[in-house]
Amino acid sequence: MSYRELVVELAREHAEALSDALLDLGALSVSVEDADADTPDEQPLFGEPGLVPDRTAWQHSRVVALLSADHEPAVLLAAAANEIGLAETPKFVVREVEEQDWVRLTQSQFEPIPIGERIWVVPSWHDAPDPDALVLELDPGLAFGTGSHPTTRLCMEWLEQSVKPGQSVLDYGCGSGILAILAKKCGANPVIGIDIDPQAVESARQNSERNRAEVTYGLPDACPEGEFDIVVANILSNPLKLMASMLASKVKPGGRIALSGVLARQADEVAAVYARYVDISVWREHEGWVCLAGTRRESH
């Protein structure tokens, strides 16, 4: 069977309703994406702390629907638009999707990723290219963080250079658990991973088990009291600013903090908020993203 992809870009207030209508009318699957992804106008993921709670799509949204060949895209979209009360049918693009081995195709798109001096992130269907490398086995999944995004890479490079055996590490916004797992493999103990998404927490636990890395995961209300030698947070600039006091308070005096999910143009603003608590600056930039790193002052 052949398939078609119907791609529609429209305003935030209609994206979720159109998605539901397309599914009701027979679409096989529908996803909503940020139409400005990987540009300076990219918006934070929804559900992050400090964001508008009822915001369910991006300001400039892209709806992508997978249709079987027996559905006419224009007719289906017109019906969906009418169902949700749009005055006119949005502009759209149709892409032909060839029938193929989707599992094999997906796997072929994810190769082992070298990071830093000795780290390899390796999907389960591959062998590590270097038997002496520090290997993290991680498959692409629902939780963010496979090492391919610049912010994940930056944090991993920083951890590789910064973690000393026996140091305590807090990974706040742990996603897939990739940073917490790396910290553990670098000798940190204990390592704590926190995320607001229960699905991410479960994914991180599974990834840690697969990598034989003992990490404790939980939701924010389960974050332990006390301070850590190292705190790392790869989130986004808005929640990072909102949580500055809390995150800084988790760092021991003289301990270190690394922040990413920050675009280069946002670096000064984020650094200014954290400067109240830590001596912080841009550690490294990659593809328009930065990692900020700093040390908590002995007293403040």
From Swiss-Prot:
UniProt key word S-adenosyl-L-methionine: yes
Sites where the protein binds S-adenosyl-L-methionine: 152, 173, 195, 234
Name of the top EC class for this enzyme: transferase
Signal peptide: none
Keyword list, A-Z: Cytoplasm, Methyltransferase, S-adenosyl-L-methionine, Transferase
Alphabetical list of NCBIfam families matching this protein: prmA (TIGR00406)
Name used for this protein in its record: Ribosomal protein L11 methyltransferase
Taxonomy of the source species: Bacteria, Pseudomonadati, Pseudomonadota, Betaproteobacteria, Burkholderiales
